[in-house]
């Protein structure tokens, strides 16, 4: 493996330090902050809507001279989801899913989530009309990277599954980042040849970041969201964590609105609107979450988004969601994330950004919350991260009731050194005694201010009538503690082989 190569998640384009406008999102400061924006929007829409539409789109489009992408006539109104999703009764069911890399065994009897490869195929089996996917890039075959390895078979089976859906006239719609990182992959060309609709979103030109989201909306009823890319390595060589929600049209159609922000920006000459039209607005957010039973368990849930410029009115900003989860904790905050930097990561000159770092310290000091941070270390780790991790660890003072612990999780390379950009814990989640957060972003400023991502925030209470029911935050806590107590999680003073981790 060439140490000078960069992992796809680290190849986010350099950004200039641009101030982000105050977009009409739900913020942690004022639950009614969008009201004035809505009134102003109503006054302006009559004069500006025609101009805005003409500026955003100039006719039907095809992205390449080979006409890989079907021509479409864009519209501010998103594509209507097929079927009768709005009429379906919600009987929401949430399932945690994960990928455990090959040759990464845990102790017998350890808690597990449903295997991601199996869960994705089962989710696609439910599709009757449409599958909408927001993705960073696609690389589902070993040939994409010149690797002949049996561990690529699950990704190849997934690609075949998508082709089968298209042959059954099930719509497959993909919004992905442009330019793609998987430059030798033919996955999207293959799907387009079978009738998939694909748009590439030049996110760097629009927000200064990338389209880093990883979620699916199936039939306007079912959802996947999590850390896994559309990459065969995410199924067998990289540790991932996500969630699938079945039969939850209210949440699914709310997440669909975020998908549609990407979709409309994937047209030629698209620009970010100063104010998103009302049909992109959300009424499900931090201050007004969806409330109802998930498998009989009382649940609140909502989606957040980043960056602020992709938050129409009512959408909670991802950073505000993360801070809100921390603020609500009373006993513990456990975080598992690939990278942790209290700085910018992709600007020409790094800028200090202590927002999340301060929030963890404040929770530990002010409320006596037990903080645990599990960060990944692998062959492509930037070793400057460890100074920040040691600084946070040094804040711990058990005699004063301040508990902050930091470990690194290392996936041994073993005999898999022939597979580049693998063998890493890629999860991005947080769990407290009150709430579970499953996201798509690493923790540095750029992911929240410039890069497109989403978060799922869920809180459950065990009903008295179901004393044996396990809340999603309890399930996620068990998975975190399994990882934390395993021999793959190491204290910051440990020495490890450089093949597995650049310390």
Curated annotation (Swiss-Prot):
Residues of the PLD phosphodiesterase domain: 207-234, 421-447
Residues passing through the membrane, by range: 37-57
Lumenal topological segments: 58-503
Keywords attached to this entry: Cytoplasmic vesicle, Disulfide bond, Endoplasmic reticulum, Endosome, Exonuclease, Glycoprotein, Golgi apparatus, Hydrolase, Immunity, Inflammatory response, Innate immunity, Lipid metabolism, Lysosome, Membrane, Nuclease, Nucleus, Phospholipid metabolism, Repeat, Signal-anchor, Transmembrane, Transmembrane helix
Record keyword Hydrolase present: yes
Subcellular location per the Swiss-Prot or TrEMBL entry: Endoplasmic reticulum membrane; Golgi apparatus, trans-Golgi network membrane; Nucleus; Early endosome
One Pfam entry name: PLDc_3
Phenotype when the gene is knocked out: Deficient mice exhibit a phenotype of chronic activation of the immune system, with splenomegaly marked by elevated levels of IFNG. PDL3 and PLD4 double-deficient mice develop spontaneous lethal hemophagocytic lymphohistiocytosis with substantial liver pathology and die at 2 to 3 weeks of age. This phenotype could be prevented by expression of a single allele of either PDL3 or PLD4.
The keyword Lipid metabolism is assigned to this record: yes
Disulfide bonds: 92-248, 377-501
Reactions performed catalytically: Exonucleolytic cleavage in the 5'- to 3'-direction to yield nucleoside 3'-phosphates; a 5'-end 5'-dephospho-ribonucleotidyl-ribonucleotide-RNA + H2O = a ribonucleoside 3'-phosphate + a 5'-end dephospho-ribonucleoside-RNA + H(+); a ribonucleoside 3'-phosphate-2'-3'-cyclophospho-GMP + H2O = a ribonucleoside 3'-phosphate + 2',3'-cyclophospho-GMP + H(+); a 5'-end 5'-dephospho-2'-deoxyribonucleotidyl-2'-deoxyribonucleotide in single-stranded DNA + H2O = a 5'-end dephospho-2'-deoxyribonucleoside in single-stranded DNA + a 2'-deoxyribonucleoside 3'-phosphate + H(+)
Domain of life: Eukaryota
Record GO cellular component, one term: endoplasmic reticulum membrane
Recorded effect of pH on activity: Optimum pH is about 5.
PTM comment, free text: Highly N-glycosylated.
Induction, per UniProt: Up-regulated by lipopolysaccharide (LPS) stimulation in microglia. Increased expression in activated microglia and in the demyelinating lesions of adult brain.
Regulation: The exonuclease activity toward ssDNA substrate is Ca(2+) and Mg(2+)-independent, but it is inhibited by Fe(2+), Cu(2+) and to a lesser extent Zn(2+) ions.
BP GO terms, sorted: establishment of localization in cell; hematopoietic progenitor cell differentiation; inflammatory response; innate immune response; lipid metabolic process; phagocytosis; regulation of cytokine production involved in inflammatory response
Family according to the record: Belongs to the phospholipase D family.
Official protein name in the record: 5'-3' exonuclease PLD4
Organism in which the protein naturally occurs: Mus musculus (Mouse)
Lineage, broadest ranks: Eukaryota, Metazoa, Chordata, Craniata, Vertebrata
Gene name in the database record: Pld4
């Amino acid at each position: 493996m060439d140490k000078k190569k960069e992992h796809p998640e680290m190849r986010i384009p350099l950004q200039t330090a641009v101030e982000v406008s105050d977009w009409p999102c739900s913020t942690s400061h004022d639950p009614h902050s969008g009201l004035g924006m809505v009134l102003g929007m109503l006054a302006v829409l009559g004069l500006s809507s025609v101009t805005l539409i003409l500026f955003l789109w100039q006719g039907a489009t095809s992205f390449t001279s080979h006409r890989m992408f079907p021509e479409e006539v864009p519209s501010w109104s998103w594509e209507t989801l097929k079927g009768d999703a709005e009429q379906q009764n919600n009987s929401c069911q949430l399932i945690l899913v994960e990928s455990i890399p090959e040759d990464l065994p845990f102790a017998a009897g350890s808690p597990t989530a449903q295997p991601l490869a199996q869960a994705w195929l089962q989710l696609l089996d439910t599709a009757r009309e449409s599958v909408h996917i927001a993705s960073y890039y696609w690389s589902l075959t070993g040939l994409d990277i010149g690797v002949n390895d049996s561990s690529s078979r699950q990704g190849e089976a997934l690609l075949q599954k998508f082709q089968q859906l298209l042959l059954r006239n099930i719509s497959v719609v993909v919004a992905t980042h442009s330019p793609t990182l998987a430059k030798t992959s033919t996955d999207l060309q293959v799907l387009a040849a079978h009738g998939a609709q694909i748009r590439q979103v030049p996110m760097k030109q629009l927000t200064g970041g990338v389209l880093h989201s990883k979620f699916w909306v199936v039939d306007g009823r079912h959802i996947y969201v999590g850390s896994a890319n559309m990459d065969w390595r995410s199924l067998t060589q990289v540790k991932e964590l996500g969630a699938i929600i079945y039969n939850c049209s209210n949440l699914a159609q709310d997440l669909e609105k975020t998908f549609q922000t990407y979709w409309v920006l994937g047209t030629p000459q698209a620009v970010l609107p100063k104010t998103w039209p009302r049909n992109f607005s959300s009424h499900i957010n931090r201050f007004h979450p969806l409330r109802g039973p998930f498998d009989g368990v009382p649940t609140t849930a909502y989606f957040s988004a980043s960056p602020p410029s992709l938050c129409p009115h009512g959408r909670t900003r991802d950073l505000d969601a993360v801070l809100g989860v921390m603020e609500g904790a009373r006993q513990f905050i456990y975080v598992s994330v690939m990278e942790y930097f209290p700085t910018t990561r992709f600007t020409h000159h790094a800028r200090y950004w202590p927002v999340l770092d301060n929030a963890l310290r404040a929770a530990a000091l002010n409320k006596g919350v037990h903080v645990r941070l599990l960060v990944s270390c692998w062959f492509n780790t930037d070793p400057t991260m460890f100074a920040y991790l040691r600084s946070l660890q040094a804040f711990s003072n058990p005699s004063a009731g301040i508990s902050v612990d930091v470990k690194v999780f290392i996936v041994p390379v073993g005999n898999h050194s022939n597979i580049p950009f693998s063998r890493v814990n890629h999860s991005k989640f947080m769990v407290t005694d009150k709430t579970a957060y499953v996201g798509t972003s690493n923790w540095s400023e750029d992911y929240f201010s410039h890069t497109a991502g989403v978060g799922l925030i869920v809180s459950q209470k065990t009903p008295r009538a179901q004393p044996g029911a396990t809340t999603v935050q309890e399930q996620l806590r068990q998975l975190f503690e399994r990882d934390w107590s395993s021999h793959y999680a190491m204290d910051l003073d440990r020495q490890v082989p450089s093949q597995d981790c650049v310390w």
